[in-house]
Amino acid sequence: MTEQSSKKASIMIMHDELCQVFNGLMTALSLQRAGAQVTVFFGSRGINAVHKEKIKELKCLPDQPEEEQIKVMARMEAMNLPMPEELLLMLHMEGATLLACPLNKEVFEFAADDFVEGVALADPATYYTDIVMPAAMNLVF
């Protein structure tokens, strides 16, 4: 792992479609390993990606025929790509900040212990001013 720099990266994951979650988490991990201070925010339906049970139900390409979904998942498995659970653990262990939207937590009636390890609730009073605005890049998935 590269030593962290002063560059900050803000990643927002707003969808619960597996490919988008995967791309957001892989981007976050790549930036973290390149030395950026990474914060990943899970809002809207993206909050499902950090729920202990719902993360297991994420679908790849849900708008495509089932055979296409199966082919893509098989290719990902053949490439030995990590699943979101593994990526979240890597990000947490490597020092990224993982935040869930407190509004969506209430809307979807999640309990505090529903989240995977390492996820905290974002502070609405400071999230944008302390995380988003100072970031060198803000990416949304």
Question: What are the language-model segments listed below?
Answer:
Residues 38-44, 99-102:
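Short internal beta-strands
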Residues 84-128, 136:
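A charged, amphipathic interaction segment
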Residues 59-93:
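A glycine-rich helix N-cap at a beta->alpha junction
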Residues 8, 132-136:
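Polar low-complexity intrinsically disordered regions
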Residues 21-35, 40:
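Histidine-anchored nucleotide/phosphate-binding helix
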Residues 10-21:
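Short, glycine-rich nucleotide/cofactor-binding loops
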Residues 56-60, 116-119:
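Short, hinge-like loop/turn segments at secondary-structure boundaries
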Residues 46-59:
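N-terminal beta-loop-helix "entrance" segment that forms/cooperates
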